[in-house]
Regions:
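Non-catalytic terminal extensions of PLP-dependent enzymes
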Residues: 3-260
């Protein structure tokens, strides 16, 4: 396929997902951890009706069969409840890499790796993801992304695993972080920092409270147009974050990049 076209992006994204899935499977067989692609663990071959482990699925099937990317109700890998079958699907070129620690029931395991520390590590190697959540690092495949480029990402993930497992000193692998607070990070290794962050995530239950915050949508008190008119009329004022309760935001907030 012509890699100047959208089909090329899809092919490369599928190849990268398969590579990470196969690497995860190999490490799992050795009882070792690795990252995993965020997608279904199995897909169905429409010709045979058989279920195939994702890491064994033909690339051509994944690149041409939309059913491979549908979020079906009741599947633990995506965690969404109450969705109708066939209502939504993954965009294969939005490649989410899941860090160890989030269990299929949505609970945090005793140990895990915060995605932020992975992003910081990748950033030092010049790899900048499109988005980072508590447990996932997201990359967008676009025109120009080739095996050479995503291969660099895979090598960086392998490097991270090596440095994490050996608890490499922060001064070596995250020197800017270590230099920003030398007393705080003195003598700490990469795994030390990850374990401390993970313990805080479990204790604070930040994922739970974030989910609660978005579980109930607010009641609109004013249209965006009216709020903007108030802003233009000089009727808006700056307030600190702790003073925003029961106030109407006069300036719109636009999520970017779109679709994420």
């Amino acid at each position: 396929r012509d890699h100047l076209q959208g089909a090329g992006c899809l092919d490369e994204a599928v190849a990268c997902r398969l590579a990470v899935a196969r690497m995860a499977r190999e490490f799992q067989a050795k009882q070792q951890w690795f990252f995993a692609p965020w997608n279904a663990d199995q897909v169905t071959d429409p010709k045979t009706g058989k279920r195939i482990p994702f890491h064994e699925a033909p690339a051509a099937l994944l690149a041409t069969e939309p059913a491979c990317w549908v979020l079906h109700p009741g599947e633990s890998w995506h965690g969404f409840e109450g969705i109708p079958d066939g209502w939504c699907m993954l965009d294969p070129i939005k490649f989410g890499i899941v860090c160890p620690g989030m269990q299929t029931d949505g609970q945090l395991a005793a140990t895990g790796i915060p995605a932020d520390i992975v992003t910081a590590y990748l950033g030092r190697q010049g790899i900048v993801p499109s988005r980072t959540t508590d447990h996932m690092v997201l990359f967008l495949f676009s025109v120009g992304i080739t095996k050479g480029k995503w291969g660099t990402l895979l090598n960086a993930l392998l490097d991270f695993k090596t440095d994490y497992d050996r608890n490499a000193p922060l001064t070596e692998v995250l020197p800017r972080v270590a230099a920003a607070a030398p007393d705080r990070y003195a003598g700490m290794g990469l795994k030390d920092l990850g374990d401390e962050m993970w313990a805080h995530m479990r204790k604070s239950r930040q994922g739970h409270w974030q989910a609660q915050a978005y579980a109930t949508l607010p009641t609109p008190e004013m249209t965006p147009r009216r709020a903007f008119q108030q802003l233009m009329a000089g009727a808006a004022e700056k307030v600190p974050l702790d003073g925003m309760a029961d106030r109407v935001v006069a300036v719109g907030v636009i999520p970017y990049p779109p679709g994420i």
